[in-house]
Curated annotation (Swiss-Prot):
UniProt entry keywords in alphabetical sequence: Organic radical
Residues forming coiled coils: none
SUPFAM superfamilies: PFL-like glycyl radical enzymes
Domain Glycine radical per the UniProt entry, residue ranges: 5-128
GO CC terms of this entry: cytosol
InterPro entries referenced in this protein's UniProt entry, alphabetically: Auton_GlycylRad_Cofactor, Form_AcTrfase_GR_CS, Gly_radical, Glycyl_radical_cofactor_GrcA
Functional description taken from the UniProt entry: Acts as a radical domain for damaged PFL and possibly other radical proteins.
Modified residues (Glycine radical): 103
Molecular function GO terms recorded: formate C-acetyltransferase activity
Protein's name in the database: Autonomous glycyl radical cofactor
Natural source organism: Haemophilus ducreyi (strain 35000HP / ATCC 700724)
Length: 128
């Protein structure tokens, strides 16, 4: 469990009135705020490095955070390969053909020929 403290007494003047988060399970102290430049904000040290101190507890409200790394992205285009290839050859037949590219809706005919081929290649594969 994490406990918030304000150090009220210490032989080290740089610690007096500083604020820390103590994680007793990890035996770590994280500096929240301190005078001078000995302890930096967000610096983590072992709790015993604080030495003999007196402190008062500070209420800490820790909300769990969701951390997403990587993630997934999906564009859904409900089309046949033949439709897109025909749209390349006969753009006048498909003036309203709209597809999804990187989360945006875009008219297929407004893409460059290279982009159109890229969409077809990425959308239609032989296997996963």
């Amino acid at each position: 469990m994490i406990k918030g403290i304000q150090i009220t007494e210490s032989s080290n003047n740089n610690l007096v009135n500083s604020f820390w988060l103590l994680d007793e399970e990890k035996n770590e102290a994280r500096c929240i705020a301190a005078k001078g430049d000995v302890y930096q904000e967000d610096q983590v040290i072992a709790i015993n490095e604080l030495g003999q101190i007196a402190y008062r507890e500070i209420p800490v409200n820790i909300a769990p955070t969701i951390k997403v790394e990587g993630g997934q992205h999906l564009n859904v285009n409900v089309l046949r390969r033949e439709t897109l290839e025909d749209a390349i050859k006969n753009p006048e037949k498909y003036p309203q053909l709209t597809i999804r590219v990187s989360g945006y809706a875009v008219r297929f005919n407004s893409l460059t020929p290279e982009q159109q081929r890229d969409v077809i290649t990425r959308t239609f594969t032989e296997s996963l």
